[in-house]
């Protein structure tokens, strides 16, 4: 194999996005074991928190097994080299919760906003920079904007101080051309580093990540065993192997990654991470990945096929935070109304 001449940084989100695959039930001991394995493998940024991000442990998004600061401290204490990061979604997280995460030991924050709403990131990005954090920013549901308008949003994020701006395929709706075009547009528009976050609903998460790198992305997200919302993320250990085969230097060691995935993560999984019908249609319809489990529950409750609910949600252009629309659509498709207690039961 030839000596790699290009470099890409792998960021692992098993302990944040991957939380969605285990109903946010990783314990602090689980977090410590996984973080230690990632650190030994050379992963230098590890994202930790509730699956939706800081402050999301709730009846709306599901209760986690521990608090965000407990998770952060467990990870910080377990690593020797890696930075521990958290996800901050304006409207869910607060600056007080971010401050608590800083006190617990994070050195990186990832601020995530819908792809048309970069303005919402200004306050947390500026606060984080003032407090000495590395700031990565997410343009969620990036498939909903064409490349040039997406790049305009990236320019705003850079102006607030973002160190990295991510193209984020929150729905797993992109194919490689979509990923490449959007990253290339950002590369022309900003000087900040560019990242790419894939979901695997159409089975092309790894291909999308490789194409993103070819077009200028230098940070690539993954999760061990592909854990993550709906169909899951690009699989970290597969990314490491694929990038090495493609001639890229990642700085991580493949076999320690595989060992952590097989010996630590796999026994904690409650079900295989697969592209089932719901995950596939979710990506096809371009619906946010966190709609996965609520849509399945609504389909069972109202006796409506999940695909019909997701296709209608896609037609309505729903975004993250509009999960209440799932029940509205399921009820309409079922041709009956629902009362408030029934809705709360979803």
UniProtKB/Swiss-Prot annotation:
Transition state stabilizer (site feature) positions = 16
Regarding protein family, the annotation reads:
Belongs to the 4-hydroxy-2-oxovalerate aldolase family.
What taxonomic ancestry is recorded? Bacteria, Bacillati, Actinomycetota, Actinomycetes, Mycobacteriales
Q: Which GO terms describe its biological process?
A: catabolic process; L-leucine biosynthetic process
Keyword DNA repair assigned to the entry: answer is no
Residues of the Pyruvate carboxyltransferase domain: 8-258
Its name, as the record gives it, is: 4-hydroxy-2-oxovalerate aldolase 2
Signal peptide bounds:
none
Gene3D superfamilies named among the record's database cross-references: 1.10.8.60, Aldolase class I
What is the source species?
Nocardia farcinica (strain IFM 10152)
Question: Could you tell me what reaction this enzyme catalyses?
Answer: (S)-4-hydroxy-2-oxopentanoate = acetaldehyde + pyruvate
Q: Which residues bind substrate?
A: 16-17, 170, 197, 288
Q: What residues bind Mn(2+), as annotated?
A: 17, 197, 199
**EC code:** 4.1.3.39
**Keywords on this record?**
Aromatic hydrocarbons catabolism, Lyase, Manganese, Metal-binding
- GO molecular function annotations of the record: 2-isopropylmalate synthase activity; 4-hydroxy-2-oxovalerate aldolase activity; manganese ion binding
- The keyword Nucleotide-binding is assigned to this record: no
């Amino acid at each position: 194999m030839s000596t790699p001449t290009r470099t890409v940084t792998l960021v692992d989100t098993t302990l944040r996005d991957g939380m969605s695959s285990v109903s946010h039930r990783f314990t602090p001991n689980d977090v410590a074991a996984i973080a230690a394995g990632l650190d030994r493998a050379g992963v230098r940024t590890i994202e930790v928190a509730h699956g939706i991000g800081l402050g999301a442990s709730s009846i709306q998004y599901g209760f986690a097994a521990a608090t965000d600061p407990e998770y952060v401290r467990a990870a910080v204490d377990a690593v020797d080299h890696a930075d521990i990061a958290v996800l901050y979604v304006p409207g869910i997280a607060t600056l007080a919760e971010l401050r608590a995460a800083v006190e617990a030991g994070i050195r990186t924050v990832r601020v995530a906003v819908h792809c048309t709403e970069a303005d919402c990131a200004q306050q947390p990005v500026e606060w984080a920079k003032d407090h000495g954090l590395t700031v990565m920013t997410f343009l969620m549901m990036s498939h909903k904007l064409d490349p040039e308008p997406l790049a305009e949003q990236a320019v705003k994020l850079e102006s607030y101080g973002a160190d990295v701006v991510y193209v984020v395929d929150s729905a797993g709706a992109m194919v490689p051309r979509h990923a490449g075009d959007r990253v290339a547009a950002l590369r022309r528009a900003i000087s900040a580093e560019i990242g790419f976050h894939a979901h695997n609903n159409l089975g092309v998460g790894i291909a999308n990540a490789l194409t993103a790198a070819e077009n200028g992305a230098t940070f690539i997200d993954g999760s061990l065993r592909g854990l993550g919302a709906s169909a899951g993320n690009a699989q970290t250990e597969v990314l490491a192997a694929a990038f090495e085969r493609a001639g890229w230097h990642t700085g991580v060691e493949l076999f320690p990654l595989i060992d952590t995935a097989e010996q630590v993560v796999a026994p904690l999984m409650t079900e295989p991470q697969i592209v089932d019908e719901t995950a596939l249609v979710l990506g096809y319809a371009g619906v946010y990945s966190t709609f996965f489990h609520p849509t399945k529950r609504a389909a069972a409750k109202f006796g409506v096929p999940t695909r019909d609910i997701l296709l209608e949600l896609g037609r309505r252009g729903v975004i993250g935070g509009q999960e209440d629309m799932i029940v509205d659509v399921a009820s309409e498709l079922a041709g009956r109304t629902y009362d408030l207690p029934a809705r709360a039961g979803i």
